[in-house]
Amino acid sequence: MRICFLLLAFLVAETFANELTRCCAGGTRHFKNSNTCSSIKSEGTSMTCQRAASICCLRSLLDNACDSGTDIAKEEESCPSNINILGGGLKKECCDCCLLAKDLLNRNEPCVAPVGFSAGCLRSFNKCCNGDIEITHASEIITGRPLNDPHVLHLGDRCASSHCEHLCHDRGGEKVECSCRSGFDLAPDGMACVDRNECLTRQSPCTQSEDCVNTIGGYICQRRISRLVPHRHRANRIGNAPRRMRDDPYSRAGEYREASQANTEFGCPMGWLFQHGHCVDVDECNLGSHDCGPLYQCRNTQGSYRCDAKKCGDGELQNPMTGECTSITCPNGYYPKNGMCNDIDECVTGHNCGAGEECVNTPGSFRCQQKGNLCAHGYEVNGATGFCEDVNECQQGVCGSMECINLPGTYKCKCGPGYEFNDAKKRCEDVDECIKFAGHVCDLSAECINTIGSFECKCKPGFQLASDGRRCEDVNECTTGIAACEQKCVNIPGSYQCICDRGFALGPDGTKCEDIDECSIWAGSGNDLCMGGCINTKGSYLCQCPPGYKIQPDGRTCVDVDECAMGECAGSDKVCVNTLGSFKCHSIDCPTNYIHDSLNKNQIADGYSCIKVCSTEDTECLGNHTREVLYQFRAVPSLKTIISPIEVSRIVTHMGVPFSVDYNLDYVGQRHFRIVQERNIGIVQLVKPISGPTVETIKVNIHTKSRTGVILAFNEAIIEISVSKYPF
């Protein structure tokens, strides 16, 4: 029975990854600016951010030391020996690796690095091997530009063309950085990712009652079944991501279950799993919990498994790293056997030598020579002298139309551009520049296509071939008319991007611009664009104000129009009162036995005063203790909330010591207002939210008292308050 596991992997939050990237970039930038990694100014205050900045700063320091060592090796023939300074060891290592590459080039040896070089050493070795050669269509070796030339590699393409197996990070430096997903470690070459064996590297990832089984990218904690099956669920894990065993009745979270009474004394041996009252075989091959290498095939057995060596057919070759079998194509004169190309002995299988000749087998071919000739290949006996003399094969026309060069015991044909001489087959063969000089023939933004005697470079979409036939130049779609952007076009390497003017957003087709309705977006957000009304326009918006208001220079604020200042009320018997959004003309109307204080003795703003005048015979008038009636007119906006009291009116009584004044609010309603007293001043305040349009009238009784508390005078203040429809 096969046991399947559901693997659940939790991804690290993108915001946290972006935070670490920002912190790392800060450390890199610190080294570039200061050339040190002390007193790093981190992008964040957390210990995690500071640690990331320190790591990336030291990485930049070591990369700089390696590059410095490479530069020294290009100019000098010896490397610095001071390895006790920070980065000194890596500087000398990269210098030695570059000198090794130069030695191989000087001896015309293949520039191939051995296994075991560090990532920095390998980069220096390859730079000194490949950075100074460039192959043209004619296969001539000339001096060219290195691969990190900004004209060859566009920054935007570097991750797309990198050899990172998992993740690539382009931080804008000289090179990109590779990293691996959770459960993998970066290989020494700095690009490949290898599985991390958590069962060996982590400290007790599983409990004592569980076996740790390594898997690709994670591990599994596999429970051992003891006498008592009940077991609190423990999640199987890949890295830190929990997963649950399917069809396992004892793997459900928070459950306890017991085996039947008939099986409570039953225990399963290693390689078996207790399930549904029985011990069932664990298929280690299907679970991937076996340790067979890539050169072996896992075969499940009852309670265990075995590893059988993989075998390939006679015409196949086994990859020593992956174990895969690939077909072998042998050249003429060879046949495949046991994964190798073996020479065909034409002298046995058949040849065309004459009667006076004998057949001599050669690698991949054969030759006919005079019988009894004891000379080596390429030589023949001189009948007169009895000595072996070189055979001038060029006189036999062996090279055809090509130039022939006779050599002791052999010959060589001088091949044309794009060809090379195969000494075993004695013929000129086409050079596949795309394979032999991979990465150095065409731009990284191009595909290399081999042709007979040459090669061609085919650029990727968005690029065009330069005049040298090898480099790819970016096509500016914005200026050539390829781009169909409605408003603005921005060229990027290999493509383009449409952008819109302010007030527009890019549509779904990526070319057309759609108007943004700013009024709808901001409506009801508490941060409206306009104080009054908002009207959307193409690419913008327009603010309007209600009647009685005017727009301010900022284009969004509304202020009240003071109609009274414009002389709207005419006549001395009227008082013009400006309200929010309007105005009122109040006729001066005093009660009986009161006359208008035309001299405005009490200096009432937005109102008037009426003074009592009685004849000596009018006892009723004389009995009225109210000496003065004040009329005030005020305006307030509609307010949904009030954080602190708002002053509406201020009444001043000009009475000094030893007299005192009391202010009392005579007001019936929802109690939106109150009056507070500061010495001889009464202040009317709005204390509760109020909505308009409406008019509120309140009365304030003013009593003047003597030092002994006797009321000496009565006065009244009648305040009419206009509440606006708007909150401004």
Curated annotation (Swiss-Prot):
GO biological process terms held by the UniProt record: extracellular matrix organization; positive regulation of locomotion; protein localization
Glycosylation sites: 624
Signal peptide segment: 1-17
Disulfide bonds: 23-49, 24-56, 37-57, 66-94, 79-95, 97-121, 98-128, 111-129, 159-168, 164-178, 180-279, 285-298, 292-307, 347-359, 353-368, 375-388, 394-404, 399-413, 415-428, 434-448, 442-457, 459-472, 478-489, 485-498, 500-513, 519-534, 530-543, 545-558, 564-576, 569-585
Keyword match Zinc: no
Anaphylatoxin-like domain boundaries: 23-64, 65-96, 97-129
InterPro entries per record: Anaphylatoxin/fibulin (IPR000020), cEGF (IPR026823), EGF-like_Ca-bd_dom (IPR001881), EGF-like_dom (IPR000742), EGF-type_Asp/Asn_hydroxyl_site (IPR000152), EGF_Ca-bd_CS (IPR018097), Fibulin-1 (IPR017048), Growth_fac_rcpt_cys_sf (IPR009030)
CDD domains: EGF_CA
Reported consequences of knocking out the gene: Gonads have short and swollen arms. Pharyngeal defects. Movement is lethargic.
Coiled coil start-end: none
Domain called EGF-like: residue spans: 155-194, 195-280, 281-344, 343-389, 390-429, 430-473, 474-514, 515-559, 560-610
Gene Ontology molecular function terms on file: calcium ion binding; extracellular matrix structural constituent; peptidase activator activity
Record note on quaternary structure: Homomultimerizes and interacts with various extracellular matrix components.
Name of this chain's protein: Fibulin-1
Gene (name only): fbl-1
